[in-house]
Amino acid sequence: MDLSRIPPQPKAGILNVLIEIPAGSKNKYEFDKDLNAFALDRVLYSSVQYPYDYGFVPITNNLADDGDPLDGMVIMVPPTFPGVATARPIGMLQMVDGGDRDEKFLCVPAKDPRYTYVKSANDLAGHRLDEIFEFFRSYKNLFKKPTEFFGWKGDVAGLPLVEECVKNYYKTYCKNDHGK
């Protein structure tokens, strides 16, 4: 699978999120570049499970310099399977995970008319945001990895981050004019 062929933003205000983990799973899969496949990274051995579909935005390299792409959670019912979800970001959870900056985009499916009214994370029922926050607050407790939170940002605040992370990806991995 050549992930470099999947654009991070097919059009303004839309992200491609490559789903690695369906909602309800306790198994954390990550795309392994060497295997060119999804591989089991670890099992969440606490009582938590992923509340919504989870994956990453291709051709991005986050600014924490850990080599990981930007993360995205897509509120999709029912859960899907690994593949590309065209999604509209409605917010971004700002956090530090294990000492590294680690933003999480919160998205809704771009092609689901049930979410046309949702323009920001604040348009969701408060319980949904609490559920997502609680998942990220506790999912690494038994791994003894601390997490810190700095709150939610609206969708407009997150999109410049995507552009920065695309540039960082090309600068890190391609060493050509794309990163300028």
Swiss-Prot record:
<keyword id="KW-0378">Hydrolase</keyword>
<comment type="function">
    <text>Catalyzes the hydrolysis of inorganic pyrophosphate (PPi) forming two phosphate ions.</text>
</comment>
<keyword id="KW-0479">Metal-binding</keyword>
<feature type="binding site">
    <location>
        <position position="54"/>
    </location>
    <ligand>
        <name>substrate</name>
    </ligand>
</feature>
<feature type="binding site">
    <location>
        <position position="66"/>
    </location>
    <ligand>
        <name>Mg(2+) 1</name>
    </ligand>
</feature>
<keyword id="KW-0963">Cytoplasm</keyword>
<feature type="binding site">
    <location>
        <position position="71"/>
    </location>
    <ligand>
        <name>Mg(2+) 1</name>
    </ligand>
</feature>
<feature type="binding site">
    <location>
        <position position="102"/>
    </location>
    <ligand>
        <name>Mg(2+) 1</name>
    </ligand>
</feature>
<feature type="binding site">
    <location>
        <position position="42"/>
    </location>
    <ligand>
        <name>substrate</name>
    </ligand>
</feature>
<comment type="subunit">
    <text>Homohexamer.</text>
</comment>
<feature type="binding site">
    <location>
        <position position="71"/>
    </location>
    <ligand>
        <name>Mg(2+) 2</name>
    </ligand>
</feature>
<dbReference type="GO" id="GO:0004427">
    <property type="term" value="F:inorganic diphosphate phosphatase activity"/>
</dbReference>
<comment type="function">
    <text>Hydrolyzes PPi generated in anabolic reactions.</text>
</comment>
<dbReference type="InterPro" id="IPR008162">
    <property type="entry name" value="Pyrophosphatase"/>
</dbReference>
<feature type="binding site">
    <location>
        <position position="139"/>
    </location>
    <ligand>
        <name>substrate</name>
    </ligand>
</feature>
<dbReference type="InterPro" id="IPR036649">
    <property type="entry name" value="Pyrophosphatase_sf"/>
</dbReference>
<protein>
    <recommendedName>
        <fullName>Inorganic pyrophosphatase</fullName>
        <ecNumber>3.6.1.1</ecNumber>
    </recommendedName>
</protein>
<feature type="binding site">
    <location>
        <position position="28"/>
    </location>
    <ligand>
        <name>substrate</name>
    </ligand>
</feature>
<keyword id="KW-0460">Magnesium</keyword>
<comment type="similarity">
    <text>Belongs to the PPase family.</text>
</comment>
<dbReference type="GO" id="GO:0000287">
    <property type="term" value="F:magnesium ion binding"/>
</dbReference>
<dbReference type="GO" id="GO:0005737">
    <property type="term" value="C:cytoplasm"/>
</dbReference>
<dbReference type="Pfam" id="PF00719">
    <property type="entry name" value="Pyrophosphatase"/>
</dbReference>
<dbReference type="GO" id="GO:0006796">
    <property type="term" value="P:phosphate-containing compound metabolic process"/>
</dbReference>
